[in-house]
C-alpha cells in the first residue's frame, strides 16, 4: 500500500525513528499507526541508539531564502559546544538549502542517514526538531534573520508589495530588515489580533475577571479595567499591535502605513515565522 509523507512524519514525531524505518514499519503494519509504533519497538529501532534517550535541549536555527521559497530549520543537540561545531553548522546550512530548493519539509531517507552519521561522529543526540518552508510570490519580499553567533533564534518576515517596481527600494528593505529584528526581539505569537482564537481571548478575560473579584470596585469600573487589560495583553502578542522596535510611539501597523506612504506603494505583512532553541 502507499504510505504518505504525512503519515511517516507523524510516526517520526511520535517515536524519533528515522524516515526509512518509519516508512518500513508503516508498510509492514498496513498503515496502522499504533501497530507501526509496536513494529518499531520490535525492530529495536526506538531504543537501539542509547543516545536517543538523552535530552537535546540545545541546538541551532538555520535559514535559507531564494527567489521561490524561504525556510527555517531547528536542529536540536545536547550541548552548546556541538551547536557551534563546524560539521554541525555545515550540515545544517546544507540541509536547509536542500529543503528550500526542493520545497519539502520532510527529510528523505538519505538525509535521515546523514543525521544518524553526524550523531555517531559527534557522539550526541541530534535530530531535526522543526522545519518550516514557505513559498514566495513574485510580488512578495522576504527578510530572514538569525540572532547572534549561536543562532538560537531565527525568523523571517514576508511582505506583499502592491507595486513590484518598489521591491528594491532602500527604505522598504531597511524597514523590512528592521521588522525581522523586531520579531526576533519581541517574539509575537500572532500577526494581528484578528488571528487570535476566541477561546484564548475568553480564557484570558476570565483570568482578569478572577483577578478583580476582590477589588471591591463597582461593576462598570471592573469591566473597564478588564477591557483595558485584555486590549493591552492582546496587543503585546500580536505583531501589528506591538510598539515598533525602533520607535515605540508607533505600532508596527502604523509604521507599515508610514513606510507605504514614503515609497508610494501599499505594503502588507502577510506572514512571519519565529523559531528558537529551547
Curated annotation (Swiss-Prot):
- This protein is called what? Elongation factor Ts
Identify the stretch annotated as signal peptide in this record.
none
Q: Which GO terms describe its cellular component?
A: cytoplasm
Keywords in alphabetical order:
Cytoplasm, Elongation factor, Protein biosynthesis
Name where it mostly resides. Answer: cytoplasm
Write down a Pfam family by its short name: EF_TS
Q: PROSITE patterns, alphabetically?
A: EF_TS_1
Q: Which organism is it from?
A: Borrelia recurrentis (strain A1)
Name the family the entry cites.
Belongs to the EF-Ts family.
- Subcellular localization, per the record? Cytoplasm
Outline what the protein does. Associates with the EF-Tu.GDP complex and induces the exchange of GDP to GTP. It remains bound to the aminoacyl-tRNA.EF-Tu.GTP complex up to the GTP hydrolysis stage on the ribosome.
Which GO MF terms does the UniProt record name?
A: translation elongation factor activity
Residues of the region (Involved in Mg(2+) ion dislocation from EF-Tu) are 79-82
